[in-house]
UniProtKB/Swiss-Prot annotation:
Name of the gene this protein is made from: gpsA
Keyword Oxidoreductase: yes
Keywords, ordered alphabetically: Cytoplasm, Lipid biosynthesis, Lipid metabolism, NAD, NADP, Nucleotide-binding, Oxidoreductase, Phospholipid biosynthesis, Phospholipid metabolism
Positions contributing to sn-glycerol 3-phosphate binding: K106, G137, S139, K192, D245, S255, R256, N257
Protein's name according to its UniProt entry: Glycerol-3-phosphate dehydrogenase [NAD(P)+]
Length: 334
């Protein structure tokens, strides 16, 4: 069965998945607030961030959300974590959620500490859980656009919703694996961005592959510990939503979070680094939320804490590195 899909958010990530869904035979209407972007997409049939990619005819665009929702059998969002609440609030004013809503963004809301899926449930109410889905995993947008092989996970509370979303996204090169631990999938995608900033700092100081692999491994330990205390399955974090996404983000040349960390090591301030990148660096905001939650629950997360202190307490990076290296070497899995 082919879907009629409203895709909310036409940044590079949103466009890459909208393009994938259209190439998979679905009718897709992409929505964005920016009328100039919508006009360019509609007239030139090229995305400014990917001008080499031709847009299929069954992918259209609008800056009016009600037009995107007309006849939709599925809604997919691809906005920033900060944009999640206002976009879903606008969506709630236009429709009650009676079709699958697939979250593809990764982050934790500032101030509230809510996962993006929890924001959706707060806005639409607990009964909406039956329609909620979450897609995550190692998936660099530019590679998805090129049709490179990619493996991700999709999670949902309702088995029928899970099957419908799985069927919509699955292609010969975009492998979609079901996972029933939605909260674990969401946390893995959010927390890995903080570890990626630490890996970028390591890159900036040219500490080498040994140091970076150590950060990834100990970072995964932090993520898994945090998620387990939050009620998630540890195995979820050992898979694509945890280890897989963490590896891609920390080692990819296209990772904003890793680049951000590298720029910090080169002497830029956080604000200067964000300006130079010119796009949202989710790990900056997740570091604050994760630190607040970890402090409340007394979860020891030394790498995450160090990144937080560098960003929000003006901790000298060299001092932060020294503090990490001076920690006791406990039994590895404790």
């Amino acid at each position: 069965m082919k879907e009629t899909i409203a895709y909310l958010g036409m940044g590079m990530w949103g466009f890459s998945l909208a393009n994938l869904l259209a190439n998979n035979g679905h009718r897709v209407v992409g929505w964005a607030r920016n009328p100039a972007l919508i006009e360019q997409l509609s007239v030139q049939r090229r995305h400014p961030a990917a001008p080499h990619i031709s847009i299929p005819q069954n992918l259209s665009f609008t800056s009016h959300m009600e037009e995107a929702l007309d006849g939709a059998t599925m809604i997919v969002e691809g906005v920033t974590s900060a944009g999640m609440r206002p976009v879903l609030t606008q969506l709630k004013a236009l429709t009650e959620l009676r079709v699958p809503l697939v979250i593809t963004s990764k982050g934790i809301e500032q101030n509230t500490g809510l996962l993006l899926s929890e924001i959706a449930l707060e806005i639409f109410g607990r009964p909406a859980a039956q329609h909620l889905g979450y897609l995550s995993g190692p998936s660099i947008a530019s590679e998805v656009l090129r049709g490179c092989p990619c493996s991700v996970v999709i999670s949902a509370y309702n088995p029928d919703t899970l099957k419908q979303i799985h069927r919509a996204f699955l292609t010969p090169t975009f492998r979609v694996y079901p996972n029933s631990d939605l909260k674990g999938v969401a946390l893995g995608g959010a927390l890995k961005n903080v570890i990626a900033i630490a890996c970028g700092i390591s890159d900036g100081f040219r500490f080498g592959d040994n140091a970076k692999s150590g950060l990834v491994t100990r970072g995964l330990h932090e993520i898994r510990k945090f998620a387990t205390i939050m009620g998630c399955r540890p195995d979820t974090l050992n898979g694509l939503a945890g280890l897989g996404d963490l590896c891609t983000t920390c080692f990819s040349a296209f990772s904003r979070n890793t680049l951000f960390g590298k720029l910090l090591a080169e002497g830029l301030t956080p604000e200067q680094a964000k300006t130079k990148i010119g796009m949202v660096v989710e790990g900056v905001y997740t570091a604050l939320s994760a630190h607040q939650i970890a402090t409340h629950h007394r979860i020891d997360m030394p790498i995450t804490t160090s990144v937080y202190r560098v960003l929000y307490e003006n901790l000298d990076i060299q001092e932060g590195i020294a503090q990490l290296l001076q920690r006791d070497t406990k039994e590895e899995y404790l």
